[in-house]
Amino acid sequence: MGSKTSKMCCPQLRKKKRQKAHKEGPSSQELNDLNAKSQGPNELLQKIKEYEQEIRNILQKHQEEKTALADAHKADVEARTLVLQAQAQKDRDAETVKLLSEQAATMKAEMEEMFAELQKSYEQEKSSLTEIHQQLTDALQESVDELNSQLASFREKMKRVEESILSQDYQRHIQDYGSPGQFWEKELQSLHFVIEMKSELIREQDKRLQRHKSTMERSLELEERSRTLQQENEALKVQTQKQGAITVRLSEELLSIQTTLEKQTHRCEQLEREKEQNLYRAVIGDITQQFSLQELPVMVL
């Protein structure tokens, strides 16, 4: 930028030198005329000093123009540097937003996949528990039916005992010992009945105890699995709530970053416009001053 200004100023200097040389020609003629007319050298020396002062002023203005153009070039470089830095920061912010968006999408996909797997496991466990419950219900119904059948069988056996064993024993007792008294006859019948009843009850109770023991074990196992499933379901709900909170927080952070990025972008664009306006004013002012300085020596000469 400085070299261009120097090229612009050099023709002007050469023009001024030619004008000076042209003027110096007549000045030499005037000097000869003055010598011819016997005038003093003081006026000639004064004009030479004025020309030297004019040359120094031109050189000083040229140096000031070079300094102004160098400052304008420096301001332009600084403005472009700020624009590049703002663009780099904008790119970094965009990359950060993109990375956060990808992380949020990945986390959401993982959470949905985990929730789907847990939901599938929950449905399978629920189906298994429903099947087990149905099996237990069927088993209990079978037990009830079996108990009813055993009760009917027991009543039938009781009837047969009354009709067979007691009658046979009673008849044998009568044949062996004769007819007993009414009291002993009743006692004997009661004794046989109680013995048969106790034996049947003991056997039936033993069977029922075994079945109830097996049923209780299966019920306890079912309750334990139900509690485990409920705990896993609660843990799943808590984890889902945490994942939801994390997703909401990430969404809020992403929105905040996007808002900040938009503000920074708007601010960078505003700064860039201000820099361009200031640079434009500075360049226009320097050019105007340059033309003024270039015209001034001609007017003086």
UniProtKB/Swiss-Prot annotation:
The keyword Transmembrane does not apply. Residues 42-167, 213-281 form a coiled coil. Residues 26-41 have a biased composition (Polar residues). One of its GO terms (molecular function) is microtubule binding. Disulfide bonds: none annotated. Transmembrane segments: none annotated. A lipid is attached at G2 (N-myristoyl glycine). One of its GO terms (biological process) is spindle midzone assembly. One of its GO terms (cellular component) is nucleus. It comes from the Eukaryota. It is found in: Cytoplasm, Cytoskeleton, Spindle; Midbody. The keyword Hydrolase does not apply. Residues 1-43 are annotated as: Disordered. Keywords: Coiled coil, Cytoplasm, Cytoskeleton, Lipoprotein, Myristate. PANTHER family: COILED-COIL DOMAIN-CONTAINING PROTEIN 69 (PTHR24200:SF6), TOUCAN, ISOFORM A (PTHR24200). Belongs to the CCDC69 family. May act as a scaffold to regulate the recruitment and assembly of spindle midzone components. This is Coiled-coil domain-containing protein 69-B. It comes from Xenopus laevis (African clawed frog).
